[in-house]
Amino acid sequence: MAETSFDGARYVIKRYNCTSPLHRLRLAVSTSRAEHSFWAARQFTRIGIVTTLPVAWVQETSWGLRGRSWFVYEHTGDAIRADDLSDESDPKQIDQLLGTMVKNLVQMREHGFSHGDLKPPNYLITSSRAVMIDLDGVRQHKHARARQRALARDVARW
């Protein structure tokens, strides 16, 4: 990951590597993690889940095959990871995180989504909000049973 600024705004660039020739072949028939993260951030924003604001995704190609990719999103500002909270943390921050998590899980269930890697490091806490990050594992499920199993795994992982 890298941080940069442009025209007074701060951005984060997350790189996804292509690890092998087989990985390149798989990417020929599927979306890259950067593209998927961009899609997930847009979907979550649309349904009211607070996440990083997506700016762009970039895909490198060579000989017609996809390689590395980058996901660019707005920097969240001064934030701490949820796993940095402790018993001495501000109770308002803890309440904010828990309230946001419940709201997000309800929204995800109603719209058929699961996160795929829901855990404390994937929430950033700012002075005004809790922000869900690391969206490359997000899935939208067509069947209620699959969605319920995936959401149960998300909750258990926490």
Where are these regions (language model features)?
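Conserved ATP-binding subdomain of kinase catalytic cores across diverse folds
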Residues: M1-A82, T100-H111, H115
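Short glycine/proline- and charge-enriched loop/turn segments
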Residues: T19-H23, E88, D134, A152-V155
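Short, glycine/acidic-enriched loop or turn micro-motifs at the edges of active sites
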Residues: G77, P120, G137-R139
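AlphaC helix of the protein kinase catalytic domain
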Residues: R81-D90
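Conserved short alpha-helix within the protein kinase catalytic core
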Residues: P91, D95-V102
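Conserved catalytic-loop position in the HRD/HxD motif
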Residues: G112, D117, N122, D134
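Activation-loop N-terminal segment of eukaryotic-like protein kinases
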Residues: I125-S128
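C-lobe/activation-segment region of protein kinase-like
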Residues: V131-W158
